[in-house]
Design a protein with these regions (language model features):
Chain A
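Conserved NTP-donor binding/palm subdomain of two-metal-ion nucleotidyltransferases/polymerases, i.e.
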Residues: 2-151, 157-398
Length: 398, 89
């Protein structure tokens, strides 16, 4: 596999872009773990020329929706892009960006303190686990505890250890339930939700939550997962394989375990496809999140030839090429430099018509009216979706 | 005719969730429930109704071990949940 440049190409802002489109392009340019001097110069130039007419409300809204507000905030502030060389403001309300980044860093520290306790407890109980997504990605992709908002702690586990996990978490004050309306209690999930999740969503368990009593953290959330693959996908994969391959890593200051790089890639591809095409996520507007494409791109950039080769092998073993093809195809639309042609060619999209379909995992296939790039930055893209998810309960991990 | 291993109330509740089973057709213990109209949402509703009927709460470990593919599997689940023997509340 050819060595890929460490630095993505400089974004090409179109001179005739509308204020809304300019906001979208700026978001793509700034939502990167690293900005080169060339990118900074280009952004500063564009903001100096067109910043006054840019739809900044849309920019902030989209940055929030796509989970990248702390990151773009950091980049705007750190590279002094919010003001010209003469000190003239180029982006209004600079404080929004600094607060988003600094506040996120404090918030992530609070999560780290709590989740470290959880990892210790799970480890002390002798339960085999691997952390998915979240903090391992923060460490690998960003190397900055403030750059990426973290929500829950996703743990990949064997199903037969769930009872022990429940005991360990209960001892720490967690319960499977939802926050009460006044935010002061955790109320158990209703029986229908419990039965549905336990009989139909056997790749996950209902989340365990705990009140944080902090304004910047609604809840501490632990998401147990016993398979990377949706039940409806038909993929049968022994979670033990993934746990056998887990690697040691210090996470939240604790000796812990994360999935190996290849499994992280598979997880990122599969999860991206699931979120983009499942009604559960579409309904809450979490189907297309720039953050997820960015992180897959970064994982791909960091993958060497050995990882790529093993990735191809495991995708074949787990028969998840369809999800991988979807994920690589769409990630390449946003980050063409991150997806090597040799890798993408190995996972061709079997039927291009499926690229704009959703609902397959729900057992009801529908088609989007607009294409991916149009939908990505359209906050109202789900307004014409009439199909409804039949999954009751929390709108968290599925 | 062989006596059903379950009480009439169980059969009545199960039949109510099998729209593709003729009313006068026997409820065979090995009948494929999905083929006779029991979908995933209806399964959840059925389990809730059976819990209420029999006055039991199915433990999680039993839920995870059960396939719900035929009447006998569902009955055995409820019987196990009830301990010595399930009976209408």
């Amino acid at each position: 596999m050819a060595v890929r440049p460490d630095q993505p190409p400089v974004p090409a802002f179109r001179a005739d872009s509308s204020p809304e489109r300019l906001a979208d392009e700026l978001l793509l340019a700034l939502a990167r773990p690293r900005l080169t001097q060339e990118v900074c110069a280009r952004v500063r130039d564009v903001l100096g020329t067109h910043g006054a007419g840019l739809d900044w409300g849309r920019f902030v809204d989209l940055a929030g929706r796509h989970g990248v507000l702390p990151l773009v905030g950091r980049n705007l502030i750190r590279h002094r892009l919010a003001q010209s060389d003469e000190g003239r403001p180029l982006a209004p309300y600079r404080w929004i960006y600094s607060y988003a980044y600094e506040g996120n860093r404090r918030r992530n520290q609070a999560l780290a303190d709590e989740y470290a306790k959880v990892l210790r407890a799970v480890d002390d109980a002798g339960i085999a686990y691997a952390i998915r997504k979240g903090q391992p990605l923060v460490d690998t992709v960003y190397g900055d505890p403030g750059a990426r908002r973290v929500g829950d702690l996703d743990l990949l586990l064997r199903r037969d250890t769930l009872a022990r996990v429940a005991d360990a978490l209960t001892d720490l004050g967690y319960a499977q339930g939802r926050q009460s309306q006044n935010g002061e209690r955790i109320e158990p999930f209703d029986r229908r939700t419990q039965l549905f999740w336990r009989t139909k969503l056997t790749n996950v368990a209902l989340p365990f939550v705990k009140l944080s009593h902090r304004d910047d953290v609604e809840l501490f959330i632990i998401d147990p997962c016993t398979s990377l693959f949706q039940v409806s996908s038909g993929v049968e994969a022994d979670v033990g394989d993934f746990l056998d391959r887990r690697v040691r890593r210090t996470v939240y200051g604790e000796p812990s375990f994360v999935m190996d790089r290849t499994d992280q890639l598979i997880d990122a591809c599969v999860q991206l496809h699931v979120e983009a095409t499942t009604l559960y996520y579409i309904e809450i507007g979490k189907d297309l999140t720039l953050l997820k494409f960015l992180e897959l791109a970064e994982l791909l950039r960091a993958a060497d030839e050995d990882v790529a080769e093993e990735f191809r092998r495991r995708v074949d073993v787990y028969d998840c090429a369809g999800s991988v093809a979807w994920a690589l195809h769409h990630t390449a639309l946003l980050y063409p430099d991150a997806v090597p042609a040799a890798l993408a060619d190995g996972f061709p999209v079997a039927d291009a018509a499926t690229l704009d379909e959703y609902g397959a995992f729900d057992g009801q296939v529908h088609r989007w009216e607009s294409d991916f790039t149009t939908r990505l930055f359209d906050p109202a893209r789900n307004k014409d979706v009439t199909a409804r998810s039949n999954v009751p309960g929390p709108r968290a991990a599925v | 005719m062989r006596e059903a291993p379950w009480p009439p109330e169980f059969e009545k509740l199960l039949r109510a969730n099998l729209p593709l089973l003729d009313a006068d057709a026997p409820l065979d213990p090995g009948l494929n429930l999905a083929d006779h109209g029991l979908d995933s949402l209806a399964t959840v509703g059925l389990l809730m109704d059976l819990e209420e009927l029999l006055g039991v709460t199915i433990p999680d470990e039993l839920l995870e071990q059960t396939s719900f593919q035929d009447p006998l599997a569902v009955w055995q689940l409820m019987a196990s949940a009830a301990g010595d023997g399930a009976a209408p509340a």
